[in-house]
A protein has these predicted regions:
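Conserved catalytic-site region of short-chain dehydrogenase/reductase
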Residues: 69-70, 105-121, 136-142, 154, ...
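NAD(P)H-binding glycine-rich loop region in Rossmannoid oxidoreductase-like domains
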Residues: 45-84, 97
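Conserved beta-loop-beta element that borders a ligand/cofactor-binding pocket
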Residues: 102, 107-108, 145-173, 183-186, ...
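Glycine-rich "substrate-gating" loop/helix at the edge of Rossmann-like oxidoreductase active sites
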Residues: 133-137, 165-180, 204-216, 239-241
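Conserved Rossmann-fold NAD(P)-dependent oxidoreductase catalytic core, especially the SDR/UDP-sugar
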Residues: 89-134
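C-terminal substrate-binding subdomain of Rossmann-fold SDR/epimerase-dehydratase oxidoreductases
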Residues: 10-11, 15, 19-27, 191-319
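Adenosine-cofactor binding site in Rossmann-like domains, unifying the SAM/SAH pocket
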Residues: 31-50
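Conserved catalytic Lys-bearing alpha helix of Rossmann-like short-chain dehydrogenase/reductases
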Residues: 85-91, 140-148, 182
Length: 319
């Protein structure tokens, strides 16, 4: 990717988008489009068309689309599905119409079948039923992946797709209702430590296994793929190891300094039993994550303790 080229990140303000923006600036990219649309505006075709008409981005990172943990998927399945469908269609079509050289679309590991051989390879996509707790969201993310493939076939465009493991890091959504597992556990344990609670209750059995990639590493992988990949098949982006939710919770408790009991509530849904990606294609290309899970958790908690709580208080004051 030419660092002199114009680059658009949709959505720049999200967890991955903000890390990607910072990384591009560090690399010396001089034309990261400074007129970004917020995630909510990406659902408006005319506004997306207006941005592409003005800025004419040569490279597009399609990161946008609402997401959340099991709670958010249970509470707002239609919102999550519709938002992602609209964002995908609007950005992909405008990238084609306005001559974007290359587009990278980020799907989600939720698009894999609920019961699938581990580690999950792209050949197993569509080979079984999806996890019911996030099926609407997963269908929308699958649609974006296949839309990129269809555009490649019909219009001969360089639209590629990647499937990331669970991404976490500074700037994540730490709300207890809608956040992903790491952000939710960090906040729960931090508040329990401050208020001297004796225990923290965690959804599910603690048995499901998950793979996690730090946001800085995910941003690095996005740029690597933009530079080195142009295939029709999606590429998995993971670290090659997974942890049970119990192991994760114990590690977060240590990082946060919470010394109380961890109580798992098996009456709450677990989601998929395991989600470990087969990232051998990316590894053979020469990419590796730089941050261990523990290092990433330390950086994330330091950010949350210093900035995240203040941001949440500011948001509450506005509401």
């Amino acid at each position: 990717m030419d660092l002199q080229a114009s680059v658009y990140i949709a959505d720049r303000h999200g967890l991955i988008g903000s890390s990607l923006h910072d990384k591009l600036i560090q690399l010396g990219c001089e034309k990261v489009i400074s007129d970004p649309l917020r995630e909510s505006a990406l659902g408006d075709f005319n506004r997306v068309d207006g941005l592409f008409s003005r800025a004419r981005p040569e490279f597009v990172f399609l990161i946008g689309g609402a997401s959340g943990g099991i709670g958010a998927n249970q509470k707002s399945p239609a919102d999550l599905m519709l938002d992602n469908l609209l964002v995908n269609c609007h950005v992909i079509e405008n990238a084609r119409r306005h001559g974007t050289q290359k587009l990278l679309y980020l799907a989600s590991s939720c698009i894999y079948p609920k019961f699938v051989e581990q580690p999950m390879s792209v050949e197993s996509l569509m080979s079984g039923g999806l996890e019911p707790t996030n099926e609407p969201y997963a269908v929308a993310k699958l649609a974006g992946l296949y839309l990129c493939r269809a555009y490649r076939q019909q219009f001969q465009v360089k639209f590629i797709a990647a499937i990331p493991a669970n991404v976490f890091g500074p700037g994540d959504d730490f709300s207890l209702e809608d956040s992903h597992v790491i952000a939710a556990l960090i906040r729960k344990m931090h508040e329990a430590k401050i208020s001297r609670q004796s225990e923290v209750v965690i959804w599910g059995s603690g048995l499901p296994r998950r793979e996690f990639v730090f946001a800085e590493d995910m941003a690095d992988a996005c740029i690597f793929l933009m530079d080195h990949y142009d295939g029709a098949e999606p590429v998995n982006v993971g670290v090659g190891a997974d942890w049970s939710i119990r192991q994760l919770a114990e590690m977060i408790a240590e990082v946060v300094g919470f010394a109380g009991n961890l109580v798992f509530d098996p009456s709450k849904p677990d989601g998929m039993p395991a989600k470990l990606l087969d990232s051998s294609v990316l590894q053979k290309m020469g990419w590796r994550a730089k941050n261990s899970l523990r290092d990433g958790l330390l950086k994330t908690y330091q950010w949350f303790a210093n900035e995240g709580m203040n941001r949440d208080r500011d948001a509450s004051a506005i509401l």
